[in-house]
């Protein structure tokens, strides 16, 4: 019995230390999830919310903001005509650059005509929030 207990008691502190370490947050994954969320808002017709995910959106003049919202609506309509719309968006991968707190999120658009397209969404972290660049 001592032969079994001694190695277990010896290893127990090391196992506890290994299990209690804080896991680092994958910033690339967080940026990718944020990009996916923004595009899901776009698909739901929440154009203001999508535009709110842009890094520079609060500094836009009203006339330019209105034009961007119009362009977003036109983009969705164009996708409906060309591909029977975008059914869903998924995160393929992401790459994080710690040097300048930026990331590239690689999203897949799954179209209604059963085709897919990969798009790259450049992201930047501002005040702890991932925003589109």
Predicted regions and their residues:
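Small side chains
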Residues: 11, 35, 103-105
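Short, low-complexity N-terminal intrinsically disordered segments enriched in polar/charged residues
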Residues: 18-44
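Exposed beta-sheet edge and beta->alpha loop/turn motif
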Residues: 88-133
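Short solvent-exposed beta->alpha transition segments
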Residues: 32-37, 47-98
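Sec-dependent bacterial lipoprotein signal peptides
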Residues: 1-19
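Generic alpha-helix initiation/capping and coil-helix boundary signal
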Residues: 4, 24-28, 96
């Amino acid at each position: 019995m001592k032969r079994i207990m001694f190695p277990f008691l010896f290893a127990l502190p090391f196992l506890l230390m290994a299990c209690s370490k804080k896991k680092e947050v994958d910033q690339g994954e967080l940026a990718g999830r944020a990009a996916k969320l923004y595009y899901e808002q776009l698909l739901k017709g929440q154009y203001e919310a999508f535009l709110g995910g842009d890094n520079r959106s609060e500094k836009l003049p009203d006339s330019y903001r209105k034009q961007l919202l119009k362009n977003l609506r036109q983009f969705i309509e164009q996708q409906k005509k060309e591909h029977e719309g975008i059914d869903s968006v998924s995160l393929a991968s992401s790459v994080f650059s710690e040097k300048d707190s930026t990331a590239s999120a690689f999203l897949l658009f799954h179209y209604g005509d059963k085709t897919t397209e990969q798009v790259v969404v450049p992201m930047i972290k501002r005040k702890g929030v991932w925003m589109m660049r």
